[in-house]
Each structure stands twice: as structure tokens, then as C-alpha cells.
Amino acid sequence: MGESSNVHEKSQAFYGPNLGYIIELYEQYLEDPSSVDEETRRYFDEFGAPETSTPTEVPVSGPSFDLEKVVSATRLINDIRAFGHKAADIYPLKDHPREQELFELSRYDLTEEDLKQIPARLLSDDAPKPNASALELFRHLLDVYTGTVAIELRHLDDMEEKKWIRRQVEQGALQQTFSKEEKIELFKRLAETELFESFLHKTYVGQKRFSIEGLDAMVPLLDAMVGGLISSGSEHINIGMAHRGRLNVLAHVLGKPYEMIFAEFQHAPNKELIPSEGSIGINFGWSGDVKYHLGLDRKVVEQQKEVRLNLANNPSHLEFVGSVVEGYTRAAQDDRSEKGSAVQHDDLAASILIHGDAAFPGQGIVAETLNMTNLTGYRTGGTVHVIANNTIGFTTDPNDSRSTRYASDIAKGYEIPVFHVNADDPEACVAVAKLISEYRAKFHKDILVDLIGYRRYGHNEMDEPMNTNPVLYKAIKGHQSVRHVYAARLEEEGVMTKDEKAQIEQKIEEALKAARDLVPSEEEDADIVLPDAVHKGFPKVDTSVEREFLTQLNEELLNWPEGFGVFHKLQKVLDRRRDAFSEGGKIDWGHAETLAFASILSDGTPVRLSGQDSERGTFAQRNIMLNDVESGKKFSPLHELSTAKASFSVYNSPLSEGSVLGFEYGYNVFAQDTLVLWEAQYGDFANSAQVMFDQFISAGRAKWGQKSGLVMLLPHGYEGQGPEHSSARMERYLTLAGEKNWTVANLSSAAQYFHILRRQAEMLGKEEIRPMIIMTPKSLLRHPLATSPVEAFTEESFKPIVEQPGLGENTEKVERLVFCTGKMAIDLAEAVGKSEESLDFLHIVRVEEIYPFPVREIRDVISRYPNAREIVWVQEEPKNMGAWTYIEPRLEAVTTNRLDVRYIGRRRRSSPAEGNPTAHKQEQARIIREALSRDVVSSGAGTSTYQKDRK
């Protein structure tokens, strides 16, 4: 590029010294054209005389203008681009003042005559036409930036993005010409949208539907977005949205038949209404959900290829579905068929997230999810965000729900371009949607549309908004719907007559009535019945691995490229893993996990692991991704495993629980063939993602038929580290346990961990699959009593319970059966090993799989001890926490109240653990002492000499 082009390019973005340099060259050219280089001379030759707005004005013989005026004009043009949104016509109700005075020429000490004298090309590369004046440019940019679309780009750092968007909009991308057929089709879409809502309103009086009315243009907007994304190569389009307008989007964007929606209003059977060709996938859970939470998975043929459209199931917890949808999309983009890390293909899938104007700035999960946009493990090649902005949140005005000008402002921190669009201009909405699809295809980055409309009725159809928002709703009642606004526009343009409008609307109403007539009159059966596979639970699975093969895997896991420098301390740790296969060797927790992953990959199952510090592991136990000490280059032996038939991906996550767990859940729901694991840094922090556990993971299948095999690793155990680094709050997951909705395990050996991971991988894709929560250890990671010999991996499988070796051998003498789980079992085992007293009066049983409760296995153990007088549950958590409240009634049921069931552990507390290490040690010692002490044996069923409940 020549010198003058560079100078001119700078003049567009800056004023002051750079522009002064241009003027200096120009004045030099005027005095002596030969004094500037040839290219610059040609450039100035093209200016000629500036065009005038009236034919009577006489053009001057050569360019002549005032430097100060050019500087002011440059500032004016830049300000229109940067701040035109403040003067834009983006509010359908006209209830926000337009700051049009910002661009009054007098504020810049300019007149129209001044602008006529300045060539537009001096101020912009994208002048409206050759030889245009600055006045024409000024008027053109006002049309572009202060019309029914407002654009915010000032916060973008990437100049290429800025310039591309500006060039597109200034060259007419938002002022597209629609053909007559396109305009009529657009009207038809608006009519379908509104008349659907009207039909529901009249037919199902008083039922909630969370109408789209006031934001009707969202439907053609989504139509155009979906079409644009498909044109860019997307084969999967995943949509997340809340309840507002959801039924309309289901009907018109996803193609859910009207009759199915009407059946849900009437509580009639609707399974037989699914199209016979199976193009619509609707999974029914056994307990179900309200109609405006349900999703849809539809395969369509568009542009001569099959495309999968998915609207994610959604709870009432606003915005949390966003990260779940991002997980869907990443799973659709990733190729997991080969060894190595999964290979991402951005163009294969795309996300559209529809937000509420109050929820977008109000819910922290939004920022968590936006933060993922450029992260290697979580990016999805550009998410399209749409704020369904009806300028109210239930009854709350914007000035009470956010501290910023726009609902979209939080997106600016992530350098996301923002388009504000007036929902009463459907053609502008469609034009923006097309431009956004092109942007996503080119830059693979997030982009946002703030679709500004209103809410025709209250928050729901039984709500009276005049009580809380009288001024707003007076304006809404007097405002025509976009269907009528656009129809009047088409009539004025001569595109459509009133009769043609009436015919279109009549056909739509007839279709709605015909669909209503298909709905059965009887109500559906309300019985809740679990599927047989869920009711029966997991079958017995052989998870052992042949010793020769396991040895081969171990050897390969200890190989890395020649010259790769492993940190010397880590080198010693890894070398010990080779010795574990020698006679008498033992395998620790981290080693067992790596072997499990290697064997699972060899079986052809992809593995994905993410969490805070998961490459190394919070406690330096994993080291599954190695870092060269000189170059920092990363290497994982699992990527080069010769027997691997699928991908292995591990990512250190951002410091977020909710969004990351939601992402991994979504990934697994979409890619049910993949073993997906999420690891909390400490189990204590998992409650930051409680919505994901409560609304999605524990209940998703019962509500929506949404299967998942997600594994959640929650470090848990009392080691004197205080109340925030001790408890994963096991009690919460057990409270949520029911209908075999997930597995809750607290393991005591490396081999058990190996086998339960392999069992989970084996069950992926089967009807019995369920999520799994593992209370993973901290101090046990390298504890000798938690290690396992090679034979435990090659000759055994997972055991729901494990009996303490060396105890309970004389069945006649056993009076006490001690049940415990996880670290408590190892603490007791350690004490048993050190004890010099006879412990033949007791036996210890480790409950490894707490839920589903291993009734048969525990009953078998109890039946072997005819003289047992009591069962004791021992835990390190307080009595109101941990497993006790879950375990007690189940143990009593197993014993049919024949034995006394009692508790040893910490008393009821409000905080889970002591902050004082000394106090912790004293409590831990007391628990162990009482568990192993003969002095507190129960005197018989229903009575106990044990001290009163330590309340």
C-alpha cells in the first residue's frame, strides 16, 4: 500500500496531527502538484470540485477548505459513528428521548455550506458515492447510525472487526431492499406469531403462556439468523431461552406442531401427535415440566442438507441454560474420533442465546458464561446473543434493575459488538440478523442484538400491570402491534391490499382451529412411572483389565518425547508409577485415575475432564498434562497412547463453578458417548453451582427425559483445614437422591475409583446411565491404606461395599457392626492397625456407593453375624450433615428394627468443620476412640448405654 493510502486510512480514524499531515500535503499539492509523489498526486486529482446540494451553485475550480473546518467535520463523523446510538429511533413506544442535538452542526462550529466544501473521501473510505461532499456523508451516516438500528463498536479493540462492521453498515447492509414476495412472507410470519398468541389467549383463558407480543419480530429475526448460520456451514444450531415467547419460538422456529402445544394446555395425551416421520425429537420425562420450560430437538432439511435445531429444556432459573447450550455446541463441534485432544470445527455448530433485559445484567451466570467466549476449552466459535428487551422485569423498571444505560452493557467488557434494534421495524431486524450471521462466519466471535420492544400484557396472563406500571401500560394499550404497523406500511407501499391481508390472516386462523380439533378431549394419565431400565439400576459390569495390557498402558504413560524436560521433582513421582507394577507395588489414586482413562480410551470412549487446576490437580495428584521446564510446551501421554481409539481432552477451567459445570453437563447431554468429568477445586465450592445440581443434573431426566452420565469429582474430607476446605456437603446430594437419578459414592481405595470410572464409561449411551458424584479424597490421595495392588485392578470389579480386612472373622463374637464411608474408613483402618486390644467384638463395613443404597449387600453382611446387638454409623461430619440422616432410616429398614442403629460423629453444628487444627484432632480422635471402644456397646435392640445424643 502506498504512502497516501496509509495517510488517508489514518485520517479516517484520527484527527489532529495525522489529519494535519494530510492537509499539509494537500496544500503543498495545490502550490505545486509535482512536489508530491505520483500516487498522492493522483489521489488529490480525484477530489475535483466538491459537489453542491443545489444545481444553481457554481463549482469552484479547485479544492479549497479551512483546516479547522476539516478537523471539526472529522470529529463530527467520528462522533456519529461512536455515539449515534444515543440519537437512534430504537424504542417502539417513543418513551426514551433521542439525543439528536448531539449532532447539530452548530455544536461543531459547522454549517451545511462548510460541509459542502469538504470532500467526503477525506473523511471516510466509504463515502456514499464518488465525489460526494461531507454534507452527503453526514446525512448518510445519520441515516445509518440514528435510524431504527443503533450500533456500538467503540469498545472493540480489534480494528479489523470495527472496520468490517462499519464498512458493511455504511455500504447498505442495514438498508436492504426486500422484494414484494419477501415482504409478504415477512408479514405472514408476523401474523402467525401474533395470531397464535391471540388464539391461546381466547381458547385457554387465564393459563400462563408468557406471550411474545411486543417482541413479535423475534421470530423472523431468528428465522434469518438460523438461515444465515446454515449458509455458513452450521449443521447444529442450539438455542437457549427463558419462558418469554418460548411457545411461539417452539411453534414457528422449531416447528413444534400446534396440536402438541394445545394438548399441553388441555393436559391431554400428546405423544401420539408426534409426526410419524420422526423429524421431531421430544423426550418425555416421567414427572414432566410446565409447557413453557420444554425444549425440542428437530431435524430439518435446509439448503439441501440436514440440520439439527435444538431448543434446550430450561428451568425457571433465568440465564443458567446459557452455559448448558454452549456445552451442546462445543460437543457438536468437537471431533472425538481420533486419539489426541478433540479437534474443534467452529462452523459445524452455533449457539443462539436469548436473554431477558433484566436477567442479562442481573444474573452473574451471564458474565461467567461470556467469560468463556475465547477460552480454549470452552469457546464455541462465536455465540449469537439476543436480548428480548421488553424494557421491564416482572414489575421492575430498568432504573431499578441495572446501573447502566443499556441492558446489553455488560457485553462490552468482552468486546462484543452490540446492535440495538427497534422491534417495530421487522425489515431492520432481518437485516441485522443476516449481518450478524456473516460476522460470526468471518470472525468466529460473539455478537449481540438488543431487540427492543415492549410486553403487551403483564408478566404472565393473570398479572395486571396497570397496578404497578400505569404510565407504561397506558402507552402500550394505545400502541398498535407490529403486525398492524407493518401491514399499514405494505399497504402504503402498494405491496399488499387489505383484502390480501385478511386472506392471509384467515388461513392462519383456520390452521389454528384445525390443529385444536386434533387434540384428544380426555385428560392424560397422571401416574408417574419410572422406565424399567431406570428402576432396575445398573447391571453387573466386569471392569477388570488384563494385567499384560494394564502393564503396557502403564509403560506408555511414562513415555514422553525425546528432549522433553519434566520438572525433576515430578520426574521422581512419575518414576515411582513404574515401580508400582513390581512385586509388592501399590497404585495410588492419581495413578489409578490415569490408568482408568487410558483403558477407557482404549475401549473407544472419548474422555473430557475440566475444572480449576485439573491438568495438575488441586493437590498435585494428577499431572496428566506435563509442561516442559525449558519451553513450557505441554504434553500428555494420553494423547499419544498407541491403543487409544478416541480423544482425550483436559482443560484448566476459569474460576467459575456454575458456568463450567453447566457447560460440562451440556457437553455430556449432547455427546452421550463421552465420559465427561467436572472437578471442583474443593467440594466446598461446588455449591456455587447449586442451580446446576438442583435444576438440571438431579432432575433433568425426570422433568425432560434428558439423560446424562456426567461425573462430578468433589474433594471431601476432614483434615483440620477449616469449614471451607473440608466438606463437599454430601448431605445435599443425598437429599436430592431419588428415582435412581444419580450415583453418590465416597470411595476408600484407588482400585475402587478405577473400577467406578470404568463402570460409568461402560454404561454411557445406555438407558440405565445416570450422573455420578464422587466425594474424592485429599489426604488419601497418597495414603498407603488407600493404595491398591495391581491384582485389585486385574482381578476385581467395583464393589458397593468393602469389608475391613482382618475383622469380623469370628462371626459368633461380633456384637457391633460399624458402617462408615470414605476417609473415615481409612482413619478407622489406621486405628485398627495400631490397636493392641482385641477388636473381635466388631466388624467394619465401608459403604462405597451410598446412593443407590446397597440394600442387598448390607443385608447379606448383617445376616452373617447372629449375635450382633447394634449397628453404628460413624462419620466425621456433624450429625445434621454428611450421610447420617439419609443412612439411618435405611439401616433401620435393612435390620427390620431388630438392631439398635446409632450415631458416632460430630454433634449438630451450623458450620461444617472446626477452624482450629487442635480442636479438629481432638474431635477426630474422640470419634475413632468411641467407634472402636467396647465400653459403649448397646445393651440390646432399641436401648443403648451410649451417652445421650450429643446435641
From Swiss-Prot:
Needed cofactors: thiamine diphosphate
Keyword Oxidoreductase: yes
One of the record's GO molecular function terms: thiamine pyrophosphate binding
GO biological process: glycolytic process; tricarboxylic acid cycle
Recorded catalytic activity of this chain's protein: N(6)-[(R)-lipoyl]-L-lysyl-[protein] + 2-oxoglutarate + H(+) = N(6)-[(R)-S(8)-succinyldihydrolipoyl]-L-lysyl-[protein] + CO2
Matches recorded under CDD domains: TPP_E1_OGDC_like
InterPro entries reported for this sequence: 2-oxogl_dehyd_N, 2oxoglutarate_DH_E1, 2oxoglutarate_DH_E1_bac, DH_E1, KGD_C_sf, ODO-1/KGD_C, THDP-binding, Transketolase-like_Pyr-bd
EC number assigned by the record: 1.2.4.2
Top-level taxon: Bacteria
Any one of the GO CC terms: cytosol
SUPFAM superfamilies named among the record's database cross-references: Thiamin diphosphate-binding fold (THDP-binding)
Region (Disordered): 906-925
A Pfam family that the UniProt record links to this protein: OxoGdeHyase_C
Keywords: Glycolysis, Oxidoreductase, Thiamine pyrophosphate
Subunit structure: Homodimer. Part of the 2-oxoglutarate dehydrogenase (OGDH) complex composed of E1 (2-oxoglutarate dehydrogenase), E2 (dihydrolipoamide succinyltransferase) and E3 (dihydrolipoamide dehydrogenase); the complex contains multiple copies of the three enzymatic components (E1, E2 and E3).
Family according to the record: Belongs to the alpha-ketoglutarate dehydrogenase family.
Function per UniProt: E1 component of the 2-oxoglutarate dehydrogenase (OGDH) complex which catalyzes the decarboxylation of 2-oxoglutarate, the first step in the conversion of 2-oxoglutarate to succinyl-CoA and CO(2).
Protein name, as recorded: 2-oxoglutarate dehydrogenase E1 component
Species for this entry: Exiguobacterium sp. (strain ATCC BAA-1283 / AT1b)
Lineage start: Bacteria, Bacillati, Bacillota, Bacilli, Bacillales
Name of the gene encoding the protein in the UniProt record: odhA
